[in-house]
Each structure stands twice: as structure tokens, then as C-alpha cells.
């Protein structure tokens, strides 16, 4: 597979055309991290890796956006992400990063919920 073109789409999102037929939309960070540019040859494994990274980034950013408005328990956030992204593996990896960075903490969530009562 060959990347035919990479064009700015909206904001920090780029439209990447593969083999002049398939379009995917990637964040500028993914473009830079995976050296995505016109003329690059990709095998199926490399494309899957890029798409996985893009989906992971989207899901993680979505979770951070949701956490701006209120706290979520692990189960609530996992189910919210699963409803949108449909991949248990992806949602599990996002939850692992959220908990390791301290954004999701069931103990803290329970303590705050108890204080509200």
C-alpha cells in the first residue's frame, strides 16, 4: 500500500489517502510519530499499527474530555468508551493509562461520592 497524499483537513487533523481510494484521518502527532508522508509504502501491519495508535489517541483524548466535566468510576468510563469504540482491548489499554496516570481512581471516586451524601 502506498500513501498517495497527506493534506491538512481540520485543525490538527490530516486526511491521508492510501492507494488513491482509502481515506483515513490522523492527528498531526500520529503523522509525525509514524513518519506518514506522501510516497511512503506501508504493509498491512504498519497500517494497522498507525490506525491503532490513532484510535488509542482518540479514545484517550475523549476520556480526558469527559473527565473535565465530572469524575467517573473505572466501570463507568470503560463502558462509556466501549459504547463508542467497540474494542475491549483498546478500551482496556486506555483505562490502564488513565489509572496509571491517576485520572481514574475508584477509591477517590467513592470518597467524593460519599461526601456528597
Identify what each model region corresponds to.
Residues 1-117:
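An alpha-helical, amphipathic repeat domain used for nucleic-acid recognition
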